[in-house]
Amino acid sequence: MNIFTLKDFSIADINQILDEAEEFKNGKKVDYHGKKVVANLFFEPSTRTHYSFDKAAYNLGCRTQNFEAGNSSVQKGETLYDTVKFFESIGCDAVVIRHPKENYFDDLIGKVSIPVVSGGDGTGNHPSQSLLDLMTIREEFGHFEGLKIVIVGDIIHSRVAHSNFEIMQRL
């Protein structure tokens, strides 16, 4: 399953994801015993998103391949598609991508067979952060109905604000 934006998910899907996240927070264990590999492909600097995905993979018993564009063939012109295909070819089971190009995933849809999770695309979307924000709101209030949420900051350029606005108006 790819996660590019939250537009692709129904409210029931979102609630199911949040329910499962809560189960993990409360101690649910899954251990792939190092048999699954997640490649974290970060084309922009990141601390929280990058290492949160790294820690999540660790908690699931997965191994990670941490990629940094500045130390790769991207510097010689390698495309995002070629980079993802490489990680697919060496047996990675999924990729998490943070990329400066808005809607970068359009270049991958239907062309790669492993799941792609967006860790942020340009000023477009940041679905994983939005899911975290939704989980926090649900933990604090127990529901979404009737809440008035204010998003502050540079909302024009904020991929998190875009994702939050997109999903919160549907809740």
Model-found features: residue ranges?
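Positively charged, low-complexity intrinsically disordered leader regions
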Residues: 1-55
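Alpha-helical scaffold segments in soluble metabolic enzymes
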Residues: 16-20, 86, 107, 132-139, ...
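Short loop or secondary-structure boundary microenvironments that flank
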Residues: 7, 98, 120, 154-155
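Flexible, active-site-adjacent loop/turn segments at secondary-structure boundaries
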Residues: 1-7, 72, 142, 158
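Phosphate/diphosphate ligand-binding glycine-rich loop within oxidoreductases
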Residues: 33-138
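Glycine-rich phosphate/diphosphate-binding loop of Rossmann-like nucleotide-binding domains
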Residues: 43-56, 139-171
